[in-house]
A protein has these predicted regions:
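Nucleotide phosphate-binding/pyrophosphate-handling subdomain across enzymes
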Residues: 3-11, 21-27, 132, 250-322
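Phosphate-binding loop of NTP-binding sites
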Residues: 10-11, 26-29, 59-63, 70, ...
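Short beta-strand "acidic-cap" motif of Rossmann-like dinucleotide-binding folds
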Residues: 34-39, 134-135, 156, 234
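Beta-strand->loop->alpha-helix junctions that form or flank phosphate-binding loops
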Residues: 93-96, 227-242, 279-283, 293
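Short amphipathic alpha-helical segments and their helix-coil junctions
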Residues: 239-251
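N-terminal leader/targeting and accessory segments in enzymes
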Residues: 1-92, 96, 273, 310-313
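Residues in the short beta-alpha loop(s) of Rossmann-like NAD(P)-binding domains
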Residues: 18, 40, 139, 215-217
Length: 322
């Protein structure tokens, strides 16, 4: 893939026109011929309809690249057979970002439970250290929507299994896998496929990169089958338990949220971050909306909104501490 060096117009099909699809179109359309397709044409706004291509026409069009949105399931969509025949052309907005910005420092956070909270907390920590930091991916803006990116910009990327599964070229300076439990198996079919999608952010790393990974036998077994070049650091659940007495924020009393802090403490050593600043930021951190959010509390009743949770395994530890 030579996207960065190509100045002549290329044909792009952007499949799926949610936030990531719109940002991909805006990013690519100046120097390339772009077409869009969505299973639900009605949701495409009038100002973008001039880019729409019908299914019958796109099937006879020779696209150079197919940019697919994470919400598209190749096995259950209108273009299923077409995508399977052209899998080598399928890329993501993550791939486009990396090819145009290979020098930008990226920190990718994935896993099953607590990705958003961990990503937002890291973003806050880096901002407190006065870094030009962007929060993107599955939280914040789509990655291609960020402007005025320089070599000093740091991207904190929350990556879901859906976003990583279709990526072909994206890699990250720091890749963090915070925990793994069964999730989205209706899409990935097997636990192995689900974990392999997460490992994509590690497999493409080089010798100068670092992967900070939960101490899981399944992850270790799968990594042994790959030619891993980066430095792998396995983090146990209580590696930094000695720092727990410095925390006053009740949101990190449950086991999952505290365990996920271990990965940020480990990362801080490699980035030479100030521990006092980290602790202060953690203690002032407010929970994200709809994530383990206490919306009512009395002597006899507590109502918790955890509607953003995608699995029961993320909710149970919070209930156990409340």
């Amino acid at each position: 893939m030579k996207l960065k060096n190509e100045t002549l117009s290329k044909n792009f099909l952007i499949y799926g026109f949610g936030k990531s699809g719109i940002s991909s179109l805006k990013y690519l359309k100046k120097k390339n011929r772009c077409f869009i397709f969505d299973d639900d044409k009605k949701k495409i706004k009038n100002k973008y309809k001039k880019f729409f291509i019908s299914k019958s026409k796109l099937l006879n069009n020779n696209f150079d690249y197919i940019v697919i949105s994470p919400g598209i399931n190749i096995n259950r969509c209108q273009l299923s057979n077409y995508l399977k025949k052209n899998q080598k052309k399928v890329i993501t907005d993550f791939d486009i970002f990396y090819k145009f910005n290979p020098e930008v420092l990226t920190i990718t956070i994935t896993g099953t439970n607590g990705k958003s909270t961990t990503s937002k907390l890291l973003y806050d920590i880096l901002k407190k250290h006065h870094y030009d930091t962007r929060l993107t991916g599955n939280i914040g803006n789509p990655i291609l929507e960020e402007k005025r990116v320089t070599k000093n910009t740091i991207f904190v990327i929350e990556a879901s299994s859906y976003q990583l599964a279709y990526s072909k070229y994206f890699k990250s300076k720091f890749s963090i896998i915070i925990n793994i439990s069964p999730d989205h198996l209706e899409r990935h079919n097997t636990m192995k496929n689900y974990v392999l999608s997460k490992l994509k952010c590690v497999i493409r790393q080089n010798e100068n990169d670092v992967a900070i990974i939960t101490n899981s036998n399944l992850l270790k077994d799968l990594l042994r089958t790959k030619n891993i070049k980066s430095k792998i650091i396995y983090v146990s659940k209580n590696k930094y338990a000695y720092l727990k007495n410095k925390l006053s924020n009740d949101n990190f009393k449950n086991s999952t949220n505290f365990q996920n802090l271990n990965f940020l403490f480990e990362l801080s050593k490699h980035m030479k971050l100030n521990l006092k600043t980290i602790i202060k930021t953690i203690n002032k951190f407010k929970p994200l909306e709809f994530r383990q959010q206490v919306i009512y509390q009395s002597k006899y009743l507590k109502i918790i909104n955890d509607s953003k949770s995608t699995s029961l395994s993320s909710t149970i530890p919070f209930l156990e501490t409340n």
